[in-house]
Each structure stands twice: as structure tokens, then as C-alpha cells.
């Protein structure tokens, strides 16, 4: 099956896992924390309905803002945090960046109950997007903060810290990144949220739910090797070597 909103760059996952994901390890109701005989498909359908509501509310809010506004607060509070909440995330704002090797990494949020996974959220209308350096300085610049793209910020942080996975998004695009300190080539899993919700791509949303539900992530950095997403990654590497 083709998933037009999903892009896999590098070796983070193999494309063939998308087609067999529903039958993969870790896809039973209990693996998502569902009790009482609930079905994963039913939970995904409910999350889809709620996510569409959040999307419409967010888009209406954008219509009221000045075009030059990056809409950072609105992107975080009206869209990304509620969306990830449907996937089981509890997210906490980070008032201070993390200092590593003399640099400060101003990651905006973390998942508070799942290994404190870094989640960096920028504005939907941020002109630089995820892959370019912002042209303007942040409103409250942090001494020692590296001036780089949102994607590069999270990637460099993961390469230097003990967390294995992180998320970066501007509300349009959502990416899962993995520590790639041993790799030169970019490696990430990307979901085009704009396309999913504008075109009504339920099948793509179901893959998003099954791959990025909070129960897929490491419970803590020490248990990263046992996490479902790392298992999928290692299985993908093994299948590629065969």
C-alpha cells in the first residue's frame, strides 16, 4: 500500500514495515495500554475524529492571525500538544535549554512520563521550516545556543545526549529522529500532517498512530534497546542486510 504523506529518509525504518505494521510485534491492544477488550482500530478511529476537530479549530485560529505571525504558541497549544495527547503523550514545556559541551540546546518540550523524550515544536508559519536556519534571532536568545535549523538542533542534541529518539515538528511536518552520531546521511521518519488532514488520509494517520504512539518510545534511556520503535529499527536493519 502507498502512503503518500509518509517519507522515510536513511535507515531509521525500512519502507516494507509500513505494509505489515498491523501484524507486527507490539500491535495488540495491551501494547497500547488499552484495557477491557478495546480494539486498536477503534481507538485509532476515535483519535482520527478528534484530530480532525483539532485541525479545523487550529486552521480557523490561523485565519485570525496576521500572515507574518509564526503562530508558535497556537501551533503548540491548539494543535501539536492536543494531537500528541491522542497518542498518549504528556508534554511539558522546557523553560531552559540543555547545556552540552558549552552549547545550550533550547528544546521546547519533553514527554514527561516516557523517558523524557525531547519534542521540539516551532511555529506553523515559521518561514525557515524545519530544515533552514531561522533568519531572525529568537525573542529571548540563549547564550551559547547553536544557531541552526530545528531539525539540526534536535539531531545534534540526540547525537550528544543519552536519549535515543526525539520528535521535531512545525505542525505541518512531524519527524521522528534517532541518534545518528555514527552516520553521515540524514535519517528520519516523516509524516506530512498538512497532507494527512487536508486530504483525509486515514490510512496514513493509522500508521502514524501505530508507529508514534507514546508506548513505542523508550521508557527511559537505559531501556532504549527494549523499546518497540528501536525493535522496529533493528528489524529493518536486519531485513536490509538479508
What are these regions (language model features)?
Residues 65-95:
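Acidic-basic catalytic patches of nuclease active cores, encompassing PD-(D/E)XK
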Residues 23-31, 39-40, 83, 87-117:
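Active-site metal-binding core of divalent-cation-utilizing nuclease and nuclease-like domains
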Residues 1-67, 116-117, 121-242:
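Short, basic/polar, glycine-containing "phosphate-handling" surface segments that engage DNA
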Residues 72-76, 107-108, 120-123, 173:
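Residue-level signal for functionally critical sites in structured catalytic/ligand-binding pockets
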Amino acid at each position: 500500500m502507498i502512503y503518500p504523506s509518509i517519507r522515510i529518509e536513511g535507515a531509521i525504518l525500512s519502507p516494507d514495515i509500513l505494509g505489515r505494521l498491523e501484524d507486527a510485534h507490539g500491535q495488540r491492544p495491551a501494547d497500547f495500554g488499552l484495557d477491557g477488550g478495546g480494539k486498536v482500530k477503534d481507538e485509532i478511529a476515535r483519535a482520527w475524529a478528534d484530530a480532525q476537530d483539532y485541525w479545523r479549530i487550529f486552521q480557523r485560529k490561523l485565519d485570525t492571525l496576521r500572515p507574518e505571525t509564526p503562530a508558535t504558541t497556537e501551533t503548540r497549544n491548539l494543535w501539536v500538544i492536543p494531537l500528541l495527547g491522542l497518542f498518549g503523550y504528556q508534554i511539558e514545556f522546557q523553560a531552559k535549554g540543555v547545556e552540552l559541551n558549552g552549547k545550550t540546546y533550547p528544546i521546547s518540550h519533553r514527554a514527561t512520563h516516557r523517558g523524557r523524550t525531547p519534542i521540539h515544536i516551532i511555529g506553523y508559519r515559521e518561514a525557515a521550516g524545519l530544515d533552514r536556519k531561522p533568519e531572525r534571532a529568537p525573542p529571548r536568545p540563549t547564550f551559547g545556543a547553536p544557531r541552526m535549523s530545528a531539525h539540526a538542533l534536535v539531531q545534534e542534541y540526540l547525537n550528544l545526549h543519552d536519549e535515543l529518539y526525539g520528535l521535531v515538528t512545525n505542525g505541518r511536518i512531524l519527524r521522528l529522529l534517532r541518534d545518528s552520531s555514527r552516520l553521515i546521511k540524514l535519517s528520519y521518519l516523516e509524516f506530512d500532517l498538512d497532507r494527512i488532514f487536508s486530504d483525509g488520509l486515514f490510512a496514513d494517520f493509522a500508521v502514524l498512530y501505530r508507529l508514534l504512539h507514546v508506548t513505542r518510545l523508550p521508557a527511559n534511556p537505559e531501556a532504549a534497546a527494549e523499546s518497540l520503535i528501536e525493535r522496529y529499527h533493528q528489524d529493518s536493519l536486519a531485513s536490509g542486510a538479508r
